[in-house]
Structure formats: structure tokens, C-alpha cells
Amino acid sequence: MSQPEKSKKASRPTPTIEDYLMTMHVMERDFGEIVAARLAELMGVAPATVTMTLRRMGRDKWITGQSRREIHLTETGRDAAHSVIRRHMLTEWLLVKIFKLPIFETHDEAHHIEHAISPKLEERMIEILDNPKLCPHGNPFPGHEDLTKDW
């Protein structure tokens, strides 16, 4: 089963929750842990907003643990994070290759578009873009982190 097909089995999170999941995945990958205070900084929101959102995410089974340092993505949360990251990176490639945007402009533009991409469109983007493994900035797609582990 392809990644987009796997991702569509669970109900899709809201764009706000997708943003949290994406940021939490990056924190876990880069820092080894998800810390609520750091999450508030990265998301640009008040700590109280993060606390409320984490409660909702726990209720909806995107994460486990809601204490300040015991936050972990569930398998469903990780799959959803990978999905939005993949859609974001595919959109960046589309903006570079098709729309000829400079790479430094693609991140913000992709962020506006990533939440609207359906699994069907994601499959088509993967096909058209020849199944990329790295984004235009050189970051690995989820599942391809081994490509950059020695950098």
C-alpha cells in the first residue's frame, strides 16, 4: 500500500493539528524529545494554547502523554505527521520545477497549500516529480532519513 493510501485510512487532522504534528515530528527527530515550552516557541503561540491543543491531541489519539516532557507521537500521529511533511515537500518541488519559484520562497508558499492536497493528488505529484527522496532544501522525505544521516 502506498504512503498516501495508508495515510487516508485514519481521519485527517485539522490544518492546525497538522502543523503541530509536523513541528513535533521535527522536534523528536532533531532534539530527541518533544518539550511543550519549546513547542510553544516554535509554533509562535502561548504555552496555555499548547496545553489546550495537547489535551485535544491526546483525546484524539495523535499523541500520548501531556506532561511537559513526556509527549510522544502515536503511530497514527506519526503517520499523519509524515503525510503532511511529504505533502509539504512535494509542494516545494512542484513550486520549484513547475512554477520556477526560487527555493528560498517555497517553504512559506508550500505551507499554505499542503493542507489542501488530497491523497489522490499526492499520488499524482509523487509520480510527476519522479518520487523524490529529498526536498529542494536537501531534507529527507519521511522514511528516507538514512540518506542524510552522515551529513
Language model features with spans:
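Helix-turn-helix DNA-binding elements, focusing on the entry/boundary residues of the two helices
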Residues: 36, 54, 92
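Basic amphipathic alpha-helical segments that dock to polyanions
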Residues: 20, 39, 50-60
